[in-house]
């Protein structure tokens, strides 16, 4: 194992401290702190468990070798234990490899139509439904924070909040962080009378959502807050009061709108959370040239040539161009069956992190 012993010792001490804190009733009087501690504990628990299994297997192996020196019947057990120790050692090394610090986070996801007009907006809505169905399969909570619909019910722009309900070390971000980029579709549009296949594109942006807005420094004087009446699909009014909120961050020009909560205060709170997520992502990009390069796949302009994935309807095929993944189950993918693709993307990301370690 290439990781220094000091690393696991530090994690063991932190795990023990968190276990003590989580058993203290006083901690749970602060739900935010309790949730944060619970998430960190959940992240460390599998590492500590694997380490303890490895230590036990090493002790068993040492005992088996001593017995095998006097009795050949223990030779097979030695071989089995050597294999188990090697397996656990590799597993622990993988667990200690550098991880994305946001893996346990919830996300804000934006879907934007691009080239292709009405067809692009319809495809953007298909992508949003795909992510919603995937989230439902995993028991996550999805909230549509804002939506601008097209004449045929597509999405010109939509913002979703996707949150897990537990404290898993592998949260929503760990699964969906690879979705940022341009998604291209090849199909016969509903507006096409000649039956010709057209190509259009929609863009997806994904941000890890800070647990608290306070984690991101936002100066109130840098904000312009506008309120207006919420509207439903097709422009139908759903609220007779000015409950929708639009926040503009003046230094960066970032604009966030939220109109689907029940009150102006709730919409403002959610809009601030989305703004915090976007500003956090921008700050991290600026702070790290490597992170900026990794996020080059996140769209700057929704151009069909800057694609990360193609959805080919005539061939029922999905292709992820970053890792060469291909599958002929597009209908199932659009119904939220994304785990095979996400597993492949996660494996490629893990391999990259191990090489950089």
Swiss-Prot record:
Q: Name one GO cellular component term.
A: cytoplasm
Which InterPro entries does the UniProt entry name for this protein? PCRF, Pep_chain_release_fac_I, Pep_chain_release_fac_I_sf, Prokaryotic/Mito_RF, RF-1
Q: How is it modified after translation?
A: Methylated by PrmC. Methylation increases the termination efficiency of RF1.
Q: Using the chain's own numbering, where are the disulfide bonds?
A: none
List the SUPFAM superfamilies. Answer: Release factor
Compartments (UniProt record) = Cytoplasm
One short Pfam name that applies is PCRF
Q: Name one GO molecular function term.
A: translation release factor activity, codon specific
**The UniProt record lists the keyword Metal-binding:** no
Q: Which UniProt keywords apply?
A: Cytoplasm, Methylation, Protein biosynthesis
Q: What is its main location?
A: cytoplasm
Sites bearing N5-methylglutamine, chain numbering: 236
Q: PROSITE patterns given for it? A: RF_PROK_I (PS00745)
Record Gene3D superfamilies? 3.30.160.20, 3.30.70.1660, 6.10.140.1950
Keyword flag DNA-binding: no
Q: Which domain of life is it from?
A: Bacteria
The record describes the protein's role as: Peptide chain release factor 1 directs the termination of translation in response to the peptide chain termination codons UAG and UAA.
Into which family does the record put it?
A: Belongs to the prokaryotic/mitochondrial release factor family.
**Which PANTHER family did the record assign?**
LD18447P (PTHR43804:SF7)
- Quote the protein name from its UniProt record: Peptide chain release factor 1
Source organism (scientific name): Mycolicibacterium paratuberculosis (strain ATCC BAA-968 / K-10)
The taxonomic lineage of its organism, from the top, reads: Bacteria, Bacillati, Actinomycetota, Actinomycetes, Mycobacteriales
